[in-house]
Amino acid sequence: MLMPKRTKFRKQQKGQFAGLSKGATFVDFGEFGMQTLERGWITSRQIEACRVAINRYLKRKGKVWIRVFPDKSVTKKPAETRMGKGKGAPDHWVVVVRPGRILFEVANVSKEDAQDALRRAAAKLGIRTRFVKRVERV
């Protein structure tokens, strides 16, 4: 699963979700992509499940790019622990996504195959997404 090799601080604050995505809003590497329509957290396990779903459907045809990386640690206190006594230990890693962010890109496959593969991957996520094509930018 994806996680940073090293971070400056082990624990992070929750942060804010306001606004639209600041970067990665266009399909830059492949021909088709999956774009978010909602904001939320996507865990490293969800990213891995999406990657496996796409690769299983495409069966070595085409190329897949993962455009997000989980760089935020989420902490969790042990079960049946009373409140207080500080923040819990880091439990898993997430990426914060805002509307408009491209999550995955695929190339060298037909539009129908790309749509089906990305639809299967979207079922693994807890947020709404849409299928987008590459547009020429000057």
From Swiss-Prot:
Residues of the signal peptide: none
Species, as recorded: Chlamydia trachomatis serovar D (strain ATCC VR-885 / DSM 19411 / UW-3/Cx)
Function per UniProt: Binds 23S rRNA and is also seen to make contacts with the A and possibly P site tRNAs.
Quaternary state and interactors: Part of the 50S ribosomal subunit.
Similarity comment: family membership: Belongs to the universal ribosomal protein uL16 family.
SUPFAM superfamilies associated with the record: Ribosomal protein L16p/L10e
Protein name: Large ribosomal subunit protein uL16
GO BP terms, alphabetized: translation
Source lineage: Bacteria, Pseudomonadati, Chlamydiota, Chlamydiia, Chlamydiales
Key words, A-Z: Ribonucleoprotein, Ribosomal protein, RNA-binding, rRNA-binding, tRNA-binding
Transmembrane segments: none
Pfam families: Ribosomal_L16
GO molecular function: rRNA binding; structural constituent of ribosome; tRNA binding
Positions in coiled-coil regions: none
GO CC, alphabetical: cytosolic large ribosomal subunit
